[in-house]
């Protein structure tokens, strides 16, 4: 089962993901926490420490792997292990890739393939960054574009997609008993109504 969990900064998405994973985790199994953050400055070090402290108070004994760049390989290595995997977060992984000048098309393709082929329960945390203003800088605009494309591609592959706002989870997928999940759109993403109304 692939579950994509989206939300803004400090929306509660990480805590929600950890609780969801705790519900999935079989007894006597140590789930994997794949952390993509690097403590490049004091503020990021505090954020990392906050997440670590929050996890220590929970009921799970985590296996931690720090994976700032080679996330696809880390997923392949853990596929079929029987231990659920939580990736937190894809936004920082993307930021790391862009800062290191990676070929995003190939990195995104490798990650999407690893996710599609993953055997087990996989929870992916990512920021929803496309709801704000268009950034002024070229790198910032590219980041927002890449994050949007990545989130869309992952949402298409995911069994479940949840948006967390103010600590409240909103189920985006599945949305109803309609197996297409199309919200009235055709397979091409266009409205079936010739006037463009859904």
State the predicted function of each range.
Residues 33-35, 87, 124, 163:
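Structural beta-sheet core signal
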Residues 49, 53-54, 58-79, 84-99, ...:
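Portal/gating segments that form or line small-molecule/metal binding sites
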Residues 29-32, 83, 121, 160:
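Residues at the starts of beta-strands that form the adenosine-phosphate
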Residues 2-77:
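Conserved P-loop
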Residues 191-192:
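N-terminal polybasic/positive-inside topogenic patches
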Residues 183-185:
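Leucine-biased recognition of intrinsically disordered, low-complexity hydrophobic segments
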Residues 17, 51, 86, 127, ...:
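Residue-level signal for inorganic ion chemistry
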């Amino acid at each position: 089962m692939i579950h994509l969990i989206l939300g803004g900064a400090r929306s509660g998405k990480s805590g929600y993901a950890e609780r969801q994973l705790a519900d999935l985790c079989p007894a006597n199994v140590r789930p994997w926490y794949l952390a993509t953050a690097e403590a490049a400055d004091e503020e990021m070090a505090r954020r990392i420490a906050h997440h670590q402290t929050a996890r220590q108070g929970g009921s799970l004994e985590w296996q931690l792997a720090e994976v700032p760049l080679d996330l696809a390989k880390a997923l392949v290595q853990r596929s079929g292990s029987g231990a659920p995997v939580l990736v937190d977060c894809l936004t920082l992984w993307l930021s790391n890739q862009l800062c290191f000048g990676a070929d995003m098309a190939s990195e995104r393709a490798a990650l999407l393939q690893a996710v599609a082929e993953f055997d087990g329960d996989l929870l992916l945390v990512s920021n929803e960054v496309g709801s704000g203003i268009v950034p002024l800088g070229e790198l910032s605009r590219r980041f927002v574009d890449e994050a949007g494309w990545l989130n869309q591609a992952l949402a298409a592959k995911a069994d479940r997609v949840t948006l967390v706002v103010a600590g409240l989870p909103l189920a985006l997928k599945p949305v109803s008993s309609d197996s297409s999940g199309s919200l009235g759109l055709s397979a091409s993403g266009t409205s079936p109504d010739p006037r463009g109304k859904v």
